[in-house]
């Protein structure tokens, strides 16, 4: 069975160096004046890719020659004991892309030797010598060189296959790890709200003791879930530095689904912001109150229709409010406001949702990177815990909805220079124009 090389295969520097050394050996020991090592090219009928070509004492870059095309039957099939043909065999014409022409081939002074290992023919060794006839001892030496080149080519292909397989598996592993990190981060907001509501319910409870015990159980289980979540996040951040060993299954069984695929599949629809915002604001007002922060909402335009995705918008607003509350000190303020904007250059109508706070602000040098994964900037040096995922998730989801997200800091909401504040403005396409 003739082997072929994938178009993705790239011969290593080590293989090229080995071929060059073997070619030099042929030049010096057997007085060969032209020699070429060619590899089978997948998807090219009877085409062979030049790996190393030598003309006289000069090693020519393989790109200087084109494909070598061999008519049917010009290369004898390998025998069972892998011995070379007993007589020289012909070679077809060599096409080229440089000024260096191969020498004219005399039928009795050329050899085309198949590079065979097992049932795989991976290429050819093409040799021309203008002086002298080929003898038995020389043929044995050529056979040994052809065998060693065949083994080297197969091992190099195998190494390249494993490298490609490792890269694909590593890509899959990195995506899965990123996906889990996003899911864990998105779980934090509803879990925090659940725990806050449970504590508020417990404070206001005036019923029987049995029902109170049920509420206390909810609080305890919420705290337990939060501990498990933190533990899982910690283990994720310490993930293994290397991907587990590869299995023997083909690379084609690995299907990498990068986050970019979600851009094409996220369904968008027209809906009113009033269907999404009120419950989110209610939950975060309770969370803010527990931390002595005032959360206000100016949402007279709550019935504004946008073109977006409900679940994605919920995650975006949750993350922005969570950040606003987290980075605002006690006694601070978080404001939510809605507006309609028209961009004259494009003629498009946008609904803008601005979330402003009187928090610690974002330095100018951080504002360009704040939406990158795992980037926390100056906040990473503070005492407030975070993963640097929230705003990256926001940017990803907003992009998938065809919207925009901008940041302004300082925002002029606070007069305290130590708390310049930040405003994140979410731009959503108005549903009226779709």
UniProtKB/Swiss-Prot annotation:
Residue stretches making up the Histidine kinase domain: 182-432
Instruction: Tell where it localizes.
Output: Cytoplasm
Gene3D superfamilies cross-referenced by the UniProt entry: 1.10.287.130, 3.30.450.40, Histidine kinase-like ATPase, C-terminal domain (3.30.565.10)
How is the protein modified post-translationally, according to the record?
Answer: Autophosphorylates, probably on His-185.
Knockout phenotype, as recorded, reads: Essential, it cannot be deleted.
- Consequence the record notes for mutating residue 390 to A: Loss of autophosphorylation
Looking up PANTHER family in the UniProt record yields: SENSOR HISTIDINE KINASE RCSC, TWO-COMPONENT HISTIDINE KINASE
Q: Which family does it belong to?
A: Belongs to the chloroplast sensor kinase protein family.
Q: What is this protein called?
A: Sensor histidine kinase Hik2
Gene coding for it: hik2
């Amino acid at each position: 069975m003739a082997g072929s090389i994938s178009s993705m295969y790239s011969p290593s520097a080590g293989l090229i160096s080995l071929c060059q050394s073997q070619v030099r050996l042929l030049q010096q020991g057997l007085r060969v004046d032209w020699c070429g090592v060619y590899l089978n090219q997948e998807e090219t009928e009877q085409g062979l890719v030049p790996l190393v070509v030598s003309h006289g004492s000069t090693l020519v870059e393989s790109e200087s020659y084109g494909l070598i095309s061999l008519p049917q039957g010009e290369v004898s099939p390998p025998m069972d004991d892998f011995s070379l043909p007993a007589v020289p065999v012909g070679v077809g014409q060599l096409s080229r892309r440089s000024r260096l022409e191969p020498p004219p081939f005399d039928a009795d002074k050329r050899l085309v030797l198949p590079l065979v290992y097992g049932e795989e023919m991976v290429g050819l060794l093409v040799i021309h010598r203008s002086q002298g006839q080929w003898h038995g001892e020389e043929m044995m030496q050529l056979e040994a060189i052809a065998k060693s080149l065949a083994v080297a080519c197969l091992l190099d292909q195998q190494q390249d296959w494993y490298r490609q397989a490792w890269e694909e598996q590593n890509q899959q592993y990195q995506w899965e790890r990123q996906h889990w990190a996003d899911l864990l981060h998105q779980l934090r907001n509803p879990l925090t709200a659940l725990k806050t509501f449970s504590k508020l319910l417990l404070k206001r409870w005036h019923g029987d003791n049995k029902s109170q015990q049920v509420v206390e159980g909810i609080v305890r289980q919420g705290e337990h879930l939060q501990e498990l979540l933190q533990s899982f996040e910690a283990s994720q951040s310490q993930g293994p530095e290397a991907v587990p060993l590869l299995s023997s299954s083909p690379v084609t069984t690995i299907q990498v689904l990068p986050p970019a695929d979600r851009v094409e599949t996220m369904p968008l629809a027209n809906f009113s912001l009033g269907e999404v915002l009120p419950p989110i604001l209610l939950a975060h007002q309770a969370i803010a109150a527990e931390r002595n922060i005032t959360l206000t909402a100016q949402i007279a335009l709550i019935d504004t229709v946008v073109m977006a995705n409900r679940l994605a918008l919920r995650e975006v607003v949750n993350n922005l409010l969570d950040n606003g509350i987290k980075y605002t000190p006690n006694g601070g303020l978080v404001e939510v406001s809605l507006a309609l904007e028209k961009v004259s250059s494009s003629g498009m109508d946008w609904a803008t949702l601005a979330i402003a706070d009187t928090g610690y602000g974002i330095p100018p040098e951080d504002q360009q990177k704040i939406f990158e994964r795992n980037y926390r900037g100056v906040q990473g040096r503070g005492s407030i815990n975070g993963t640097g995922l929230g705003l990256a998730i926001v940017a990803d989801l907003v992009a998938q909805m065809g919207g925009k997200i901008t940041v302004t800091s300082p925002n002029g909401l606070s007069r305290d220079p130590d708390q310049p504040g930040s405003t994140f403005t979410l731009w959503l396409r108005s549903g009226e124009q779709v």
